[in-house]
Structure formats: C-alpha cells, structure tokens
C-alpha cells in the first residue's frame, strides 16, 4: 500500500509538472514548383537595353514559410506566466538552413500577466504577419506578406519592410473593448561595423493598435528607423563626411478588413517618408552592383510617397480563393553633394490570384499566379533614364503542418 501511495504521488507530481510547464514541437513543410519570367528594360539617350530571364524550379515556402520550432510556457502562480519560442526556418527542397541561423525566425522569451505581455529577443516586427507579435500583416492582405516575389501581398507596394529584427523588446497590452495596444523597440544587431543600441547600428521603433468588433477588424501602426551614422563606402572609397546625409525614415500604416459572410475584403494604406527599400529596390540593385555596394548606395537614396493594396478572400469550388491588386508611387532623392539636381519617380504595381484546397485539417494544396512591375524614372544632369522590371510567377505546391 505504501509503495502504491508513493507511485500515485509521483505520477501526480509528474502530471502537475507537465501541466505547469508544457513544451510543444510544431512545424510547417511547404514544397512546390514555380515558373518565373522576368524582364529588365533600361531606356536612355544612349538607347534601349533589354534582358529577359525565365526559370522553372522547385521551391520551399511559397505559400507558407517552411519551419519548425519549440514553444512552451510555465505558470509561475499569482497570475504570472513565462514562455519561450524558438523557431527555425529551412528550405525543404534542399534542407539548407534559413538565414544561416539556428533560430532565425524567432528566438524569444516572454513574461505575461494582468499587465499584458513583454517579449525579448529576435522576433517579427509589428508590421509583419510572422511570429508572436506580428499582428498587422494578417489584417492588411489576403496574401499576408505575399507568397513569392511576384505573387505579392501588400508589402510589395509598401516601404522598408524587414520582417524580423534582432535584440527586440515588445509590449502587448491586454485586450479591452476589442482593442489591443502594441509597442516595440529594436536595438539593432552587432556586426563588424555596428554595435547594438549605438549610433553605428540601425535602430527601430513602432507603436500600433488593433480593434476587432463583429465583422470588422482595424489596425493602425507608426514605425520609425533611426539609421546608422557609419561611413558610406562605395567601390572601396569612403565618401567624405559632409558630402552626403543619412535620413531617418518613418511610415504611417492603416489597414482593415470586413467579413460579409461570403467574402472577406482587406484594404491597406501606407505613407512613407525617406524610406530606403521601396518595391524591392535593394535586391534588384544588388543583382547589378553587388550586395555590399547596393546597400551603401541605397543608404543615400530615399523615397517619399504612398502605397495602397486591396484584396479579398472567398470560398468556391471546395476551396479558398484569394485575389489582390496594389499600387505605389514615390519621389526619390539622392542625398549626395555631387548629385544635386537628381530627380526620381518610382512606381510599382502588383496583381495576384491564389487558390487553396484542404485535404485534411493539417494538409492542403495550393496554386497561384502573380504579376509585378517596378518603374524608376530618373533625371540627372539633363539626362533621363527609365528602368522597368516586370515579373510573373506561377506556382503550385503542398503544405503540411505538424
């Protein structure tokens, strides 16, 4: 009897411990095929140059980012809980590690109570649709942040979208009257030329709010980037201080959705001031001049303008359909003494459609196509040049969640 009593007590203790501190392994595997066609065109007084490229590839994470992770929490009592999330991104088509990090998608710890929840670590920004705190992206577009480069969501026509940041503090309030408040500060990452929370690192801050009531959901967010003051080096030449200026950037964002029963419609608006990365200009510039020089040049080029994206989701033919269109317009300035008189106009367009069909609660197949177009019209020294990049994607694949 005594041994049975000890056994029952031990099992009870183990059960209580498992209840107080639970850990979950989860993940998503998305593998599919994608056809891409892209066309680059440059027009100037010297003539017209055109380059085309097409590819048919196996891809990972087109519809949903391929990932696995661990998350858990422990009840500390007195209304307090501590939790964590460690999430790895990888390519299911090759097995390669994402972002060269073990937990590149998220590595965070949190404490929650009646006051709300405080998070610390690497995580998604509030404006994203990823991780523990990215609330804005899911209400801004039926495609979220987008399926692929050309099956795009609202972020294609919005500015300065970096989905995750290092050394982040985030506060999420308790919900009251359908409203949740958010605040976030990112101290920047340590590297060879930048130090965390110092002027040599890019720092980031955001505040936002979300309200939900009945069929309506509305979100608003303002974010700001304090850009680093480190030297600008192009072609191994460091520009003299005073010959250029680095402008801090901010964006004002408003999004909402309405579910009328047979369809859910999304609208996202953004005003951006002195933004650097607009319509994917940095990746496109990097492909021409190299990653390092492209980043340096883009630090001097800022864009002020607006973006708008409209999308909808509805059920038909046994599955879920998505469709969206977007437009962006901005004026570009190059903040370098030797390029006075530079004027630039940037426009971007996107149109996408997608279809998802559930095979079970955890498995689905999808297909979609999308078109994007970027235009950069520049005038400098009485010369005009127009660059146009057009892209088309057709994709299909399978997603399994565990």
Name each region found by the language model.
Residues 1-22:
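Gram-negative bacterial Sec-dependent N-terminal signal peptides
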Residues 10, 69-71, 108-110, 170-172, ...:
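Outer-membrane beta-barrel architecture
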Residues 21-35, 55-190, 201-203, 210-217:
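Outer membrane beta-barrel
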Residues 29-35, 84-88, 122, 183-187, ...:
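Transmembrane beta-barrel strands of outer-membrane/channel proteins
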Residues 52-66, 102-105, 163-167, 201-205, ...:
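Residues that define the transmembrane beta-barrel architecture of outer-membrane proteins
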Residues 80-82, 115-119, 178-181, 215-220, ...:
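Repeated loop/turn-to-beta-strand initiation elements of outer-membrane beta-barrel proteins
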Residues 207-352:
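Detector for outer-membrane/organellar transmembrane beta-barrel domains
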Residues 389-402:
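Outer-membrane beta-barrel "beta-signal"
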């Amino acid at each position: 009897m005594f041994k049975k009593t000890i056994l029952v007590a031990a099992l009870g203790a183990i059960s209580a411990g498992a209840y107080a501190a639970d850990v979950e392994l989860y993940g998503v595997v998305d593998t599919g095929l994608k056809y891409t066609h892209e066309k680059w065109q440059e027009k100037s007084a010297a003539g017209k140059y055109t380059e085309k490229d097409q590819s048919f590839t196996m891809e990972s994470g087109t519809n949903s980012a391929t990932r696995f992770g661990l998350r858990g929490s422990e009840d500390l009592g007195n209304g307090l809980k501590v939790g964590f999330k460690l999430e790895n991104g990888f390519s299911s088509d090759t097995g390669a590690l994402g972002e060269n990090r073990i937990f590149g998608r998220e590595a965070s710890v949190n404490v929650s109570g009646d006051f709300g929840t405080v998070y610390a670590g690497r995580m998604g920004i509030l404006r994203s649709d990823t991780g523990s705190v990215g609330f804005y992206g899911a209400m801004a577009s039926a495609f979220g942040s987008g399926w692929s480069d050309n099956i795009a969501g609202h972020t294609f026509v919005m500015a300065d979208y970096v989905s995750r940041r290092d050394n982040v503090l985030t506060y999420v309030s308790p919900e009251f009257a359908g409203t949740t408040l958010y605040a976030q500060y990112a101290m920047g990452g340590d590297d060879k030329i930048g130090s965390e929370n110092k002027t040599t690192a890019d720092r980031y801050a955001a505040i936002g709010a979300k309200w939900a009531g009945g069929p309506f959901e509305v979100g608003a967010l303002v974010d700001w980037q304090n850009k680093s003051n480190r030297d600008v080096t192009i072609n191994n030449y460091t520009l003299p201080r005073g010959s250029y200026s680095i402008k801090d950037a901010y964006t004002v964002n408003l999004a909402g959705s309405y579910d009328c029963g047979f369809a859910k419609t999304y609208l996202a608006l953004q005003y951006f001031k002195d933004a650097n990365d607009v319509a994917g200009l940095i990746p496109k510039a990097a492909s021409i001049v190299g990653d390092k020089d492209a980043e340096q040049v883009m630090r001097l080029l800022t864009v002020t303008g607006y973006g708008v994206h409209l999308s909808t989701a509805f059920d038909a033919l046994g599955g879920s359909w998505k469709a969206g269109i977007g437009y962006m317009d901005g004026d570009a300035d190059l903040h370098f003494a030797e390029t006075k008189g530079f004027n630039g106009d940037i426009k971007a367009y996107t149109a996408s459609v997608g279809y998802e069909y559930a095979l079970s609660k955890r498995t689905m197949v999808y297909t979609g196509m999308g078109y994007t177009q970027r235009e950069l019209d520049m005038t400098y020294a009485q010369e005009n040049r127009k660059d146009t990049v057009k892209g088309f994607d057709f994709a299909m694949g399978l997603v399994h969640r565990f």
